[in-house]
UniProtKB/Swiss-Prot annotation:
Protein name: Flagellar protein FliL
Family membership noted in the UniProt record: Belongs to the FliL family.
Lineage per the UniProt record: Bacteria, Pseudomonadati, Spirochaetota, Spirochaetia, Spirochaetales
Major subcellular location class: membrane
Protein's job: Controls the rotational direction of flagella during chemotaxis.
Superkingdom as given in the UniProt entry: Bacteria
Species per Swiss-Prot/TrEMBL record: Borreliella burgdorferi (strain ATCC 35210 / DSM 4680 / CIP 102532 / B31)
Amino acid sequence: MPNKDDDNLDMGDSNVSRKGGLLPDIIIKILQILAIGIFTVAIMIIVSYFVSKMVVSQSGAPSDFPVFSNEYLGKPPMLIWYESIDEIRGNTLDVPPKTFVVKLALGYAENNVNILNELGRQKVRLKDIIREYFSQRTGQEIKNESQIKAEIKARINSILRNGEIKEIALTQIDIFDM
């Protein structure tokens, strides 16, 4: 006796059309083409990224920020320089310690006459702030002059009452091995 399942067997009748099968085949083809396109674009992006990195590294271009020209920055303000702070000596935090010798000048606005008297009265405290700053650094840390200027300027301005220092000029920085 034949099973009931035998009635559902496909005998290969070619007259039966399968409309539902055509639409998924088209969608699958479109998805395949999209996947290949996305994969190709991703590979192109990755390759161009690495090629550009190689070109930049071989060109010898510095990776630091560019130095701006004077035309772009404008003229600096006219300052009066207080240069009465003596040479400051001390030891760094290096092991073994190194000796530093520092001399600097403090620039302030030319229209501020009160700050000159205050700088004269605070001279001992200013020397102590500067000596303490350099004594808390290693010889390697002392090499970043722009950071040194900004930090010392902030420390000095925190104690001044009659104005502020606009700029610091490091006229001498020497570090000696002991």
